[in-house]
């Protein structure tokens, strides 16, 4: 009798690995199926981000340059109001969540509202003053400034390859600027200020998001909400509001459509960025942004209407573009190596646990 029990026990022990193997196979098939189902969503999210980030530059350029709308401040104000309205409705419908306003919220957001305002207004003003190729190339300084900001605020380090490609982008920008026949000092000053503010804003947003106090929607909502009244006051006292009211293009349906689109595109771009990062990664978002900038550069040369061609400028633009492509490749490679290293570490930990 004891022998029979021993045999049954041995049989059960022998079957266990087979069952475990079957379960593992089913789990792997389930994971593969889930990955297949999300491929379309990943592509859709990346495409949505690319189209959104492309449209906001083109539409802002059209409103401020082609239609000669006189007030960058009022465009920025419209974007703030649209952001607050969309997020407020989203919260009321329980589509998005963020904390209610209380006395601690200003402390939790500071200095982001000021950076948000400065970033938005300088970006719009430089869009108005610069042709699209130079705008996109000079925006690459934001990568350099972001590296400095993340190094100081987040103690982040960067590889030699990343530093060299950023250096190539900057050299290309200098070469292009040296022969920019449409040079506008105000536009250059504002785009460089915008680059600094973009870098500081990005680093502080990451710092605030890591604390998980307000979340990404809360930060965006309160950044816009806190700056509506100051922006309105500045627009009133500088005469921008009066210029906007007296603008003759309000009767033009096509202008109204583009102005409205410009107002809502700020929120749409933010949402598209979140979706792309959620379904793909921050890396994919960066690469899509890089490809978008390349398209804007070449399209701006042909259709922008304010680009003046010179060989030196053209060569500088292409040096900067080549640097951005290599930057994307190196970033992608480093990300893949990092993921592979993490996966190997997890396997090692599991192996040690099994032993």
Curated annotation (Swiss-Prot):
The gene is SLC35D2. Keywords: Antiport, Golgi apparatus, Membrane, Sugar transport, Transmembrane, Transmembrane helix, Transport. Residues 60-68, 178-184, 238-253, 304-314 are extracellular. It comes from the Eukaryota. Residues 1-22 are annotated as: Disordered. It catalyses: UMP(out) + UDP-N-acetyl-alpha-D-glucosamine(in) = UMP(in) + UDP-N-acetyl-alpha-D-glucosamine(out); UMP(out) + UDP-alpha-D-glucose(in) = UMP(in) + UDP-alpha-D-glucose(out). This is Nucleotide sugar transporter SLC35D2. It comes from Pongo abelii. The keyword Ion transport does not apply. InterPro entries: Sugar_P_trans_dom, TPT_transporter. Nucleotide sugar antiporter transporting UDP-N-acetylglucosamine (UDP-GlcNAc) and UDP-glucose (UDP-Glc) from the cytosol into the lumen of the Golgi in exchange of UMP. By supplying UDP-N-acetylglucosamine, a donor substrate to heparan sulfate synthases, probably takes part in the synthesis of these glycoconjugates. GO terms for molecular function: antiporter activity; nucleotide-sugar transmembrane transporter activity; pyrimidine nucleotide-sugar transmembrane transporter activity. Residues 1-38, 90-156, 206-216, 275-280, 336-355 are cytoplasmic. Belongs to the TPT transporter family. SLC35D subfamily. GO terms for biological process: embryonic skeletal system development; heparan sulfate proteoglycan biosynthetic process. It is a multi-pass membrane protein. It is found in: Golgi apparatus membrane. One of its GO terms (cellular component) is Golgi membrane. PANTHER family: SOLUTE CARRIER FAMILY 35. The keyword Membrane applies. Residues 1-11 have a biased composition (Basic residues). The chain crosses the membrane at residues 39-59, 69-89, 157-177, 185-205, 217-237, 254-274, 281-303, 315-335.
